[in-house]
Regions:
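Non-heme Fe(II) oxygenase metal-center motifs and adjacent flexible, charged/small-residue loops
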Residues: 1-225
C-alpha cells in the first residue's frame, strides 16, 4: 500500500491486480449535489419516497429529469426476476453493453456525468467512453459475485468506480476463494480497478440489512466495439 500525495489516494497492489482508493475523492458538498441530480424528478420527493415499495409500473411513470433509470429483469433458472437494484447506461454513440442477458444501448452524456468522468480520468489516466449506474435503494439491494470480463471491455480493463450515498462494502475474492478483501466505499469514494484483476478476482456488493439509506454507484469503463 502506497500513499500518492498528488492524487490524494492509496495505490494498492494485490496478487494479479492493482487498486487505487481515495476515500473522499469528491467532497461532501459535491457528492450531495450529485445524488440529488441523479434522482431529481417531477413527482416524488427523492429523500422520503419508499422506492422499494413502488411497482414496476409506478416506477416507470416517474419522469426523472436527468437520468433515464430502468428496472430490468433477468432470467434465472427459467424464471424472470427483477434485478435487486435500478440501473442506467450512458456512453458515446454505439457503445452498447451486454451483461446477464441484458442489452443496454447508451443514453447521451449529460454535463454532470461528463464532469465526474473527467475528474476520474485525471487519476485513471484513461479516456472512458461509458458508465454503468447502479442505484441501490437500501441495504437489501445487492450485486452478486461476478467479474467484469465481457469481451467488449478488453483484456485488462481499467474500471473507475465512484460511490454516492450510503457506505457499502465492496468485496473482492480470488477465483479460487483463497483470499478475500473488503473495502468500505463511502459517500464520495473513488476506487479504480486495473491490471489483470478481472482474470483472477471476482467482486460483489453484498446485502447489508442494517443499511437503510440509498447508494448510487457509477462504474466508468472503456467499451471496445
Amino acid at each position: 500500500v502506497e500513499w500518492d500525495e498528488r492524487l490524494k489516494g492509496f495505490k494498492i497492489n494485490i496478487p494479479h491486480g492493482e487498486l487505487f482508493y481515495s476515500k473522499h475523492f469528491f467532497n461532501k458538498k459535491n457528492s450531495d449535489k450529485s445524488i440529488e441530480y441523479f434522482l431529481e424528478n417531477n413527482s416524488n420527493n427523492w429523500q422520503t419516497t419508499d422506492w422499494k415499495n413502488l411497482t414496476v409500473e409506478e416506477f416507470k411513470s416517474i419522469c426523472f429529469k436527468n437520468i433515464k433509470w430502468k428496472h430490468d429483469s433477468i432470467n434465472l433458472y427459467g424464471k424472470n426476476s427483477l434485478l435487486p437494484r435500478i440501473t442506467s447506461w450512458y456512453g458515446d454513440p454505439g457503445k452498447s453493453y451486454s451483461y446477464s442477458g441484458i442489452n443496454s444501448n447508451p443514453n447521451e452524456w449529460n454535463k454532470e456525468l461528463i464532469d465526474i468522468k473527467e475528474r476520474i480520468e485525471e487519476v485513471a489516466n484513461v479516456k472512458f467512453n461509458s458508465v454503468l449506474m447502479n442505484w441501490y435503494r437500501d441495504g437489501e439491494d445487492y450485486l452478486n459475485w461476478h467479474t467484469d470480463d465481457e469481451k467488449e471491455l478488453g483484456v485488462n480493463p481499467i474500471i473507475g468506480s465512484v460511490n454516492f450515498g450510503a457506505t457499502r462494502d465492496f468485496v473482492l475474492r480470488k477465483n479460487d476463494k483463497s483470499l478475500k478483501i473488503t473495502i468500505p466505499l463511502n459517500h464520495g469514494t473513488l476506487l479504480i480497478m486495473k491490471g489483470e484483476l478481472q482474470h483472477y478476482w471476482q467482486h460483489s456488493v453484498p446485502k447489508r440489512k442494517k443499511v437503510k439509506d440509498m447508494r448510487i454507484n457509477l462504474t466508468f469503463r472503456v467499451i471496445n466495439n
